[in-house]
Amino acid sequence: MIPLMHDFEGETVLVVGGGPVGARKARTFATEASVVVLSPEFADRAFADAEKVRAAPDPEDAEEWVERTDPALVVAATDDSALNDAFTAVAEEHGALVNRADDHGDQSFGNVVVPATVRDDPVTLAIATGGRAPALSKHLRERFEDEFGNAGLMAELVGDLREDLRDRGVPPAERRDAVRLVVRSREVWKALDSGRYKGEQVARDVIGELPGDQT
């Protein structure tokens, strides 16, 4: 599989199954998409802003539900393999993406894998092991969160810094070098623990005087 970011803004995701896995999938996609969760019962978990539809579809009902919701993605997250098979087949016939929550990495049972994800806007990190080592995905995600907890702040700082250096007439090569110095600086990362302003101050010190600065 090839990693790919997909914009679900304005689209619908149909989650079939209201257990803990279905709830987790609903929370993931509800950050952008309109999510419909179809299940005869729902786990005592948060489903974010998803619409919960209480129904017990049979495999023969998959066509009707996919046509009714017109999803960009179908998540098959029940413990009934026949039901998951039916929704997978119908979704593929309708050109929708498919994520099989009861399968790990086999494209014949779905063409989408939802990786372990870290979000610190505007930074998004996704980690996948093809279903072979979920514990490793979780470990790597937690390690990133611990070591780069200010990734979002760093991205904002560096983005503004690039614009500032460009406006000041600093040549492209020097701009790239300056940005590399900042993102590799332990001092800047540590300073961001005290907020954006402190991080900017230390970043300026790290960069120092740059050739081509016309200010």
Please describe what each predicted stretch is.
Residues 1-41, 45-48:
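Hydrophobic, well-ordered beta-alpha structural blocks that scaffold small-molecule cofactor pockets
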Residues 12, 72-73:
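Structural motif
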Residues 55-57:
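Conserved acidic residues
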Residues 59-69:
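Short amphipathic alpha-helix with an adjacent loop that forms part of the alpha/beta core around
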Residues 73-80, 84-112:
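ADP-ribose/adenylate-binding Rossmann-like module
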Residues 100-152:
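E1/E1-like adenylate-forming module used to activate ubiquitin-like modifiers
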Residues 129-215:
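An accessory alpha-helical subdomain
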